[in-house]
Swiss-Prot record:
Keywords: Cleavage on pair of basic residues, Disulfide bond, Hydrolase, Metal-binding, Metalloprotease, Protease, Secreted, Signal, Virulence, Zinc, Zymogen. Zn(2+) binds at residues 318, 322, 333. It comes from the Eukaryota. Residues 1-19 form the signal peptide. Probable secreted metalloprotease that shows high activities on basic nuclear substrates such as histone and protamine. May be involved in virulence. GO terms for cellular component: extracellular region. Residues 20-190 form a propeptide. GO terms for molecular function: metal ion binding; metalloendopeptidase activity. Its cofactor is Zn(2+). This is Probable neutral protease 2 homolog MCYG_00239. The keyword Metal-binding applies.
Length: 367
């Protein structure tokens, strides 16, 4: 891994489509909300979300089709059946102390529209015909509440679009040029870190410690895959994927331990401007880059001893699984938090970033 440290002060600006952390035992509705996709221009998509119920709902926007961040809101296939490369961000959100601004209120039988340009987060420069669809789970709270009481699954219609490649290529990328107010210094050896290259010594120390802890947790987890079948089955469901899971943990351990030979670049600050409120860290898988956000340092402990909780070490581990340079295919955000992650099918779990972070936490804490 290559760690780059920005001299600039941290900037704070405002994923695949998945559910957030759902408390154990809460109901999941198959038909509470409806999502319909329609074309709104060359590469513009309009999602119409309808509350089919008879009571108002607060819908958590994180990791859903309503997310304001440039996450993967829809899956896109070209006319030859190949998945279109995603060029947006995969954020990890803080899953506690949810604020009212993280939610969207929807009255009974009410409808809200959310439009987004898929060319801002996908390479559509070839143009042609594309097929889009959206599916996922939206955590829900009662009206005027942020207490998650249930979840609503959704499966949209298939939308077929004919896109002009040149016009799509002219759309500005949602994650663009790094916002650098000063030069970067590459850290070639952790034992020889130039502390003057970082504007905040404490943050650099925290990141370095998190990488070290990520390496240790990943190594422990790789061993646990073969030694603790009960725990493995809790998270990954099928023993036929054990070698894949073990291999990914070993790859993350190697990447976390590397100083200048890894395939990823890890930034201790948000030079790309992707840290909206609630984002702990995020990955740009198309670039194999990871960025920490201010609350990664201010609101996460280095290494928690609480089951299913978030910390700096497992957040770093989580983000590294999103990078194709670590292991391909890279992990998605199929299920967020313990309840959703452990409810996934084996096929989804083995490609879910939080399943690896939560398993590592469970192995370390002894959950």
């Amino acid at each position: 891994m290559q760690v780059l440290v920005a001299l600039a002060a941290l900037s704070s600006l405002a994923a695949p489509v998945v559910g957030f952390s759902i408390p154990r035992g809460v109901p999941v509705s198959q038909s509470m909300i409806d999502v319909k996709l329609s074309s709104a221009g060359n590469s513009m998509v309009k999602a119409t979300i309808t509350n089919n119920g008879d009571r108002a709902l607060n819908l958590l926007k994180f990791h859903t089709i309503m997310d304001s961040n440039p996450t993967r809101k829809v899956s896109i296939e070209s006319q030859d059946g190949k998945e279109v490369q995603f060029t947006g961000m995969m954020p990890r959100y803080k899953n506690t102390d949810l604020k009212p601004t993280y939610f969207m209120s929807l009255p009974p039988k009410g409808t809200v529209e959310h439009s987004f340009d898929i060319a801002a987060t996908h390479d559509l420069s070839r143009g042609g015909q594309f097929t889009l669809k959206a599916e996922g789970m939206v955590p829900i709270a009662e009206e005027n509440s942020t207490n998650i009481t249930g979840a609503a699954q959704y499966h949209s219609n298939e939308l077929h679009m004919t896109i002009d490649g040149d016009q799509a290529a002219s759309v500005k990328s949602a994650i663009g040029v790094a916002k650098r107010d000063g030069p970067f210094t590459r850290i070639d050896k952790r034992t020889k870190i130039d502390m003057q290259s970082c504007g905040n010594r404490q943050e650099l120390q925290a990141l370095t410690a998190a990488l070290s802890a990520s390496a240790k947790l990943s190594s422990m987890s790789a061993q646990a895959v073969g030694q603790n079948q009960q725990k493995y089955m809790e998270y990954f469901k099928d023993p036929k994927y054990a070698k894949t899971v073990q291999s990914r943990f070993q790859a993350v351990a190697k990447e976390s331990s590397s100083t200048n030979n890894g395939g990823t670049t890890y930034f201790c600050s948000d030079v790309m401007g992707g840290c909206e409120e609630g984002v702990l860290a995020y990955t740009l898988p198309s670039r194999n880059q990871v960025y920490n956000c201010p609350i990664y340092y201010s609101e996460l402990p280095p290494l928690t001893k609480e089951c299913h909780a978030q910390d700096q070490a497992t957040t770093t581990l989580h983000e590294l699984t999103h990078n194709p340079a670590v292991q391909e295919p890279f992990c998605e955000d199929n299920g967020y938090g313990y309840e959703r992650a452990t409810a996934l099918s084996a096929e989804k779990a083995v490609q879910n970033a939080d399943s690896y972070a939560l398993f590592a936490n469970a192995v370390y804490v002894g959950c």
